[in-house]
Amino acid sequence: MGKEKFSRSKPHVNVGTIGHVDHGKTTLTAAITSVLAAKFGGTAKAYDQIDAAPEEKARGITINTAHVEYETANRHYAHVDCPGHADYVKNMITGAAQMDGAILVVSAADGPMPQTREHILLARQVGVPYIIVFLNKCDMVDDAELLELVEMEVRELLDKYEFPGDTTPIIHGSAKLAMEGDKGPMGEQAIMKLADALDSYIPLPERAIDGAFLMPVEDVFSISGRGTVVTGRVERGIIKVGEEIEIVGIHDTQKTTCTGVEMFRKLLDQGQAGDNVGILLRGTKREDVQRGQVLCKPGSIKPHTHFTGEIYVLSKDEGGRHTPFFNNYRPQFYFRTTDVTGAIELPEGKEMVMPGDNVSIIVKLINPIAMEEGLRFAIREGGKTVGAGVVAKIIA
């Protein structure tokens, strides 16, 4: 079956929905696709098409994020809808890592809830640079003062996690009304306002297209008759069909060749920074590649286990630990797409670290990870995020 080529006529931006469960993330995602498809062309996606995606079996393997695409007058957007439940945090992290900006959905009827806070914190942690707020279900709130109060609460929460609360666009509307074809200010007009905010508030990302090719592995599929396909978002550089690449991290570094690139099921000659792609690898077995590794230009990045980091430990109120930790504490370090256990060495004279502290640490991981200074990570314990950090200096 011949695949159509993917058009690059408009600049491409990655966004996604975040926020508390049942505040309307998926309904809003569906509303955006239907309103913008009617106006600028594209495909409307129904709620259940998007909602099914978190548990979707694609070629027999579960993918945990729904990807949709839509266009505004000026741009092409790829949009991920992250599942909202707390136990999906790992997927939220991988989803949020693919965003040039996030749409935070807050129910006007409920106001900010625990996952609202958690998702803003995660956005801060995984380096989502911009947040736009969609205050949903405004049709259910008659009191204008109450709406103002909720908006104020959201702005304060954004400030707390170092997003510019005062200048963040907050759009009032109802995703449900928009889905039902309501042409009023709460319906389609609110979606168009949101589209304008996406275009004007989220700057075109400075793509690291000139860097050495790097793509964190998110998923691996075996496709009969074609070989092994690795999916992920190209972090930087360009990958062309026929180029040699390395698989780095966890195991010994392996060399392979890219024999195909596809995006939204369309074939490309190349994948470039910012693209969500599938890369076909020659002669690589399904079991030779796993989440947590990276594909990269040969020699451009090395695997490491030993580094110093600057970390912030979440307070109890932020959902972090209730007790301090001590030297040789062994949590999981979440790099890009996976958890790796590591031991923490505290600075001399520092006996313990309290929730809410920030501290310089030395870390030794049990498996090597493709690493550079400036790489961000989360610290997790039993599936719960307890800290955030950045690689300050590589030791070995």
Swiss-Prot record:
It catalyses: GTP + H2O = GDP + phosphate + H(+). Residues 60-64 are annotated as: G2. GTP binds at residues 19-26, 81-85, 136-139. Residues 19-26 are annotated as: G1. It is found in: Cytoplasm. GO terms for molecular function: GTP binding; GTPase activity; guanosine tetraphosphate binding; translation elongation factor activity. SUPFAM superfamilies: EF-Tu/eEF-1alpha/eIF2-gamma C-terminal domain (SSF50465), P-loop containing nucleoside triphosphate hydrolases (SSF52540), Translation proteins (SSF50447). Keywords: Cytoplasm, Elongation factor, GTP-binding, Hydrolase, Magnesium, Metal-binding, Nucleotide-binding, Protein biosynthesis. GTP hydrolase that promotes the GTP-dependent binding of aminoacyl-tRNA to the A-site of ribosomes during protein biosynthesis. Monomer. This is Elongation factor Tu 1. It comes from Albidiferax ferrireducens (strain ATCC BAA-621 / DSM 15236 / T118). The gene is tuf1.
